[in-house]
């Protein structure tokens, strides 16, 4: 299970990461990654739509992707926001296939970020809402 500080939870955070992030797709997943403040913990969010399968299958895919995300936090513990979108093929994929696709897509997005690795100003920030005012 991912700690609360390591999860993307608001629709604003998801949409900002998907719109402005670096994207890389594989057979089973599409990853969007954006650099946030270097001192913020990395945060991961998951999108698993009904096209992946029924509730049982979707939850299995989410559990596997959450574990892959937790493993990646050991290497990229601070400074990134990541959104993982599961594709319909993920329903039939084994753990090894999902993990390989996740890691390959993550490595590619990190390389593409290049000089944009963690920056001082956060694109996705826990302290601001959509209007830009501090949270209470």
Swiss-Prot record:
This is Ribonuclease P protein component. It is an enzyme of class 3 (hydrolase). Coiled coil: none annotated. HAMAP family: RNase_P. Keywords: Endonuclease, Hydrolase, Nuclease, RNA-binding, tRNA processing. One of its GO terms (biological process) is tRNA 5'-leader removal. The keyword Methyltransferase does not apply. It comes from Arthrobacter sp. (strain FB24). One of its GO terms (molecular function) is 3'-tRNA processing endoribonuclease activity. Disulfide bonds: none annotated. Belongs to the RnpA family. Consists of a catalytic RNA component (M1 or rnpB) and a protein subunit. Signal peptide: none annotated. The keyword Membrane does not apply. One of its GO terms (cellular component) is ribonuclease P complex. InterPro entries: Ribosomal_Su5_D2-typ_SF, Ribsml_uS5_D2-typ_fold_subgr, RNase_P, RNase_P_CS. The lineage of its organism: Bacteria, Bacillati, Actinomycetota, Actinomycetes, Micrococcales.
């Amino acid at each position: 299970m991912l700690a609360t500080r390591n999860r993307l939870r608001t629709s604003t955070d998801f949409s900002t990461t998907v719109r402005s992030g670096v994207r890389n797709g594989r057979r089973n997943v599409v990853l969007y990654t954006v650099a946030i403040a270097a001192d913020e913990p990395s945060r991961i969010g998951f999108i698993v739509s009904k096209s992946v399968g029924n509730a049982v299958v979707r939850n299995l895919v989410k559990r596997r992707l959450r574990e892959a995300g937790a493993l990646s936090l050991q290497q990229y513990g601070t400074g990134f926001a990541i959104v993982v979108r599961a594709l319909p093929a993920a329903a039939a994929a084994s753990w090894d296939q999902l993990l390989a696709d996740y890691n390959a897509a993550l490595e590619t997005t990190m390389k593409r970020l290049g000089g944009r690795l963690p920056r001082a100003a956060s694109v996705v920030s826990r302290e601001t809402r959509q209007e830009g005012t501090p949270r209470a």
